[in-house]
Amino acid sequence: MLPLVWAGGTVTVAQAAGATLGEPRDVAFTATIDGTQQRYVEMLPDGFDPGREHDVLIVLHGHGSDRWQYVRDRRAECMVPRAVAAQHGMIYVSPDYRGPTSWMGPKAEADLVQIIATLRREYRVDRVVLAGASMGGTAALTFAALHPNMVAGVVSQNGTANLVEFDKFQDAITASFGGTKQMVPQQYMQRSAEFHADALKMPIAITAGGKDTVVPPQSVLRLARVLEQQHRPVRLIFREAGGHDTNEADTVAAFDFVIEAVAQAPRKQPAAVR
């Protein structure tokens, strides 16, 4: 079993409850969109029972990382979701989603749709929760806006909700989206969650820092404000002095909010997946 350890401590909430995740399984698959081999890591909860329904936690890595970030990294943003999945008996999935410079372009989106379809074929999957930080936090919001009926909840940490105004990592985003903002403006609009707030009816937790210069927080602050005005289940954790990271306590609070809200939400039929 993979140990789950909080930063600054030797005993975790998950360990105290006797919860663990199984060994990571590195899964290769052929992407239907282009025939290339892609990968994701899957970890089943301790005592996994294939005969009953399980929720899924899909975690999306940051820029420059890969599918192993949320499996091996000892930062709070990565350790907390592992513990959450173990504690709640969730299937834990960490995809490459087109590698270190994804930004949830069309191929990454198609891969994630395919992964969710595969999980639903292989297991009795109930609800799917997305989480990520930085590029992963952006990607989680983007995918939820594009496929709201496939996502039951979102934890977005230090991401952006507006890829039209975002001016960092433009070479990577251009390659992922198939062109610049001037060449394919519809891709940047379509993948900016701020422009699709009406689709975001699921529980969402957003963390952001006022001094984050890597992924400035203004767009997620605006998105959270709109969601609050629409009486959506949203929790914003904003630290004026915070930078491009989220501490352990705020990460725990964000996941607690979403997991609890998802558990209380009425069931809905899963979307058909292609």
What are the residue ranges of the model-derived segments?
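Primarily recognizes the serine-hydrolase "nucleophile elbow" in alpha/beta-hydrolase
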Residues: 118-121, 126-172
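Short beta-strand/loop motif that positions the catalytic acidic residue
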Residues: 200, 206-208, 212
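Short substrate-entry loop that stabilizes the transition state in hydrolases
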Residues: 49-54, 60-104, 164
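Alpha/beta-hydrolase active-site loop
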Residues: 103-122
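A domain-start/cap signature at the N-terminus of enzymes
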Residues: 8-54, 186, 234, 255, ...
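C-terminal catalytic histidine-bearing segment of alpha/beta-hydrolase fold enzymes
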Residues: 104, 214, 218-274
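Mobile cap/lid helix-loop segments that gate and shape the active-site cleft of serine hydrolases
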Residues: 69-76, 159-196, 202
